[in-house]
Regions:
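Membrane-integrated ABC transporters
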Residues: 1-188, 201-210, 228, 232, ...
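Transmembrane helices of ABC transporter permease
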Residues: 178, 210-221, 225, 287-337, ...
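Loop segments that connect adjacent transmembrane helices in multi-pass transporters
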Residues: 249-250, 254-266, 337-387, 457
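Cytosolic ends of transmembrane helices, especially the final helix of ABC transmembrane type-1 domains
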Residues: 341, 361-364, 388, 435-463
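Helix-to-loop junction immediately C-terminal to a conserved catalytic motif
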Residues: 531
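Conserved "ABC signature" C-loop
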Residues: 567-608
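Catalytic Walker B motif of ABC-type/P-loop ATPase nucleotide-binding domains
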Residues: 637-641
Length: 688
């Protein structure tokens, strides 16, 4: 039996993950474990969410058949709802305007039972309430003939265990250190009780020797704690460097389709997830170990003194667990609401800050300000609910602790009065109980944070499980030009409309090939396919008669120079934007800049271009982009709208560059609307 059992409960990581979570839930229902990240990819979930077609195609790859049905719910009564075939994915239109998917697993006379990815829990509600948000679109699920229960994707538990296995030596040292700290704390408590009894019984003893013993214990405790702090800091740094290094190394080798389905904010948040996981592996596990050892030791000590004292300590555990369960159940839903509110607020701020000039032109400042304020108020109102629950939980825990402390004082005092317990034992009981309370609170804090840590591990494992671009393959001959050929190429982004449908053309060395067509017809997509940024759905893309799928990605992209539109510049100097890690002299950099007509008298190579090149005009940015391509001396040139930001002089300069590159025997492919380039082209292909 597999250690990692399948489940039907999945909570979405982001606001667009409800569709993939429903696929994971269905797979779990049929006994197959699937990761959310994998479900996102096979369903072509993008930044706007998942389409019904994407859900159907993704389910097909899992061996599940989904039959889409649309119906008018105004004619449905309770009997028709009860006849709904389950399981089924149901589309909801929420009152806040968001589109949502849930999985219905059962119906009865009382209502419908469904799994909601918003909180990852099962819910039951009446048919009347459910139909108020249901759009009438159902995806009826059934197992296909090729269904297999072989797990697909990486689960968060497996990913966390792999991390723990990588750092098991450090974790073991932390456990030993926690055990020693607990032992010294208990030794201090027992010694306090012994000293109290000796003082109360004899009234005369060598206090200085006892003081030295206490000082020794405190010194040893300080040493262990200081070592623990330093050790945790060292391990935290190593885990940070290791995880961030692995994430960066993996992230920039992923296919372009991955970045189509995820926002920049989501990628940045994965780096924050590294910090959460690091805290769990270092401080969390060692804190859990120290707390666990202390709880066990306290229960043993108190039971050895008195059964009521032991039962008092044990009784706190279910009380704390109940509080923890209640808070976790609320926070699970609250986290999703915060995620939705934060996503809406962040997207609004990003959009309106980027459009600030247009907002001023339209005199819409007040409207935008009110819109952003409402989004922020919704976010704060949602976060306020979670904050209040947490504070009430802490207050409840403190109250329970106070009651338990009073109980221990009363019971200990009663035992002292009847001569069953000494004053020293009471001191021991109070001291270890104080340790017990702080340890239980620490363990509860770990338990409360566990769902967030698990989600962070799941989100990070989703990225780490994405297959990288193929790095091996045939190496193209350096310095040689190759023909580029498309044979009946078809391509679509995700499961959307076809961008290219049976497109064919051939570009030859020593020739300029011009590709024209209206906006959105697939001209820029053609350039990305040549670079093997995406895989064609069908057809062949050949470089020198070799399929781009068989060519080494590094070799392919070194052979091809690509000038994109608009120019993509880093927030760095002009020199760094042209070199991009390569070793060229300043003289060579200046030479290619002069070829493009860049005015070196106005700008130095050390000038920072700003974020996205905002310190430069569009024409200047385009010249730097062309210079960056030329300095690498590629044998195949692909230029996307090279004259878009150029004036008459700039266009003439670019046309001269194209002639020179053609005359030197290179393969030149130009994508443009500019009619002036028609006279320059040797072959013209129109995309329709």
């Amino acid at each position: 039996m597999s250690l990692f059992k399948t489940t039907r409960l999945f909570q979405q990581h982001g606001i667009t993950d409800c569709g993939p979570c429903c696929l994971c839930s269905l797979a779990g229902h049929y006994g197959k474990r699937v990761g959310i990240g994998y479900a996102r990819r096979i369903s072509a979930t993008g930044r706007e969410g998942t389409t019904v077609l994407g859900m159907s195609e993704g389910a097909k790859r899992l061996g599940i058949r989904l039959d889409a049905v649309r119906t008018d719910l105004s004619e449905w009564d309770s009997r028709q709802w009860q006849e709904l075939p389950v399981p089924a994915i149901v589309h909801l239109s929420k009152s806040n305007g968001l589109q949502h998917f849930v999985v219905a697993y059962g119906t009865s006379a009382d209502g419908i039972s469904y799994m909601d990815p918003a909180d990852g829990l099962m819910h039951e509600c009446s048919f009347e309430s459910f139909s108020g948000e249901c759009s009438g679109v159902f995806l009826l699920a059934s197992k296909a003939s090729d269904f297999s229960t072989v797990p697909t994707g990486t689960g968060n538990t497996r990913f966390l265990l792999s991390l723990i296995a990588d750092y098991k030596r450090y974790i073991l040292v932390s456990f030993v250190c926690s055990l020693l700290i607990m032992a010294m704390s208990f030794a201090q408590a027992l010694l306090s009780g012994w000293v109290t009894d000796r003082l109360a019984g004899q009234g005369n003893m060598e206090i200085k020797y006892i003081s030295l013993v206490f000082l020794g214990i405190v010194t040893v405790l300080f040493g262990f704690n200081a070592f623990s702090i330093g050790y945790h800091a060292m391990v935290s740094k190593q885990i940070d460097n290791s995880l961030v290094g692995r994430l960066c190394g993996h992230l920039f080798r992923l296919p372009a389709s991955f970045f189509d389905s995820i926002s920049v904010g989501e990628v940045v948040s994965r780096f924050l997830d590294v910090s959460r996981i690091k805290g769990y592996v270092t401080e969390g596990l060692s804190g859990l170990a120290l707390g666990g050892f202390t709880v066990i030791g306290t229960v043993i000590v108190l039971f050895s003194m008195s059964l009521p004292l032991g039962f008092c300590a044990v009784g706190l555990i279910p009380a704390y667990t109940l509080v923890c369960w209640h808070v976790n159940r609320y926070l699970k839903r609250n986290r999703t609401q915060m995620m939705e509110a934060q996503a809406l607020m962040t997207s609004g701020i990003t959009e309106h800050v980027a459009m600030t000039m247009k907002t001023r032109q339209l005199c819409w400042q007040n409207g935008v300000s009110e819109k952003l304020q409402k989004a922020y108020e919704r976010f704060t109102s949602v976060s306020y609910g979670g904050m209040v629950r947490m504070r009430y939980a802490r207050l409840l825990i403190q109250t329970v602790c106070s009651i338990a402390t009073i109980f221990i004082i009363v019971v200990s005092s009663f035992y002292i009065c009847i001569g069953v317990m000494s004053l020293g034992k009471m001191v021991v009981a109070m001291t270890v109980f104080t340790l017990y309370v702080s340890s239980v609170v620490s363990v509860i804090g770990f338990v409360i944070s566990w769902p967030e840590i698990r989600s962070a591990a799941d989100r990070l494992s989703d990225i780490m499980s994405v297959e990288q671009e193929r790095q091996d393959g045939i190496e193209l001959v350096s310095g040689k030009s190759f023909p580029v050929e498309f044979r009946d190429v078809c391509f679509a982004y995700g499961y959307g409309m076809k961008v290219l449908d049976g497109f064919s053309f051939k570009a030859f060395p020593g020739k300029i090939t011009l590709i024209r067509g209206r906006n959105g017809i697939g001209k820029s997509t053609t350039a990305r396919l040549i670079l093997n940024m995406y895989d064609a759905d069908s057809g062949e893309i050949l470089i020198g008669g070799i399929s781009v799928r068989d060519i080494s990605t590094t070799s392919l992209r070194k052979t091809i120079g690509y000038c994109e539109q608009p120019a993509a510049l880093y927030n760095a100097s002009i020199r760094e934007n042209i070199l991009c890690g390569q070793q060229w002299t300043d003289e060579e950099v200046e030479r290619v800049l002069r070829r493009t007509g860049f005015d070196l008298s106005r700008f130095s190579l050390d000038m920072m271009v700003g974020e996205g090149g905002k310190s430069l005009s569009g024409g200047e940015s385009q010249r730097i982009s062309i210079a960056r391509m030329l300095i690498r001396k590629p044998q195949i040139l692909v230029l996307d709208e090279p004259t878009a930001f150029a004036d008459a002089d700039g266009t003439a300069c670019i046309m001269d560059i194209l002639r020179e590159e053609r005359d030197s025997g290179r393969t030149v492919i130009v994508i443009s609307h500019d009619d002036r380039l028609d006279t320059l082209a040797d072959h013209i292909f129109n995309l329709r």
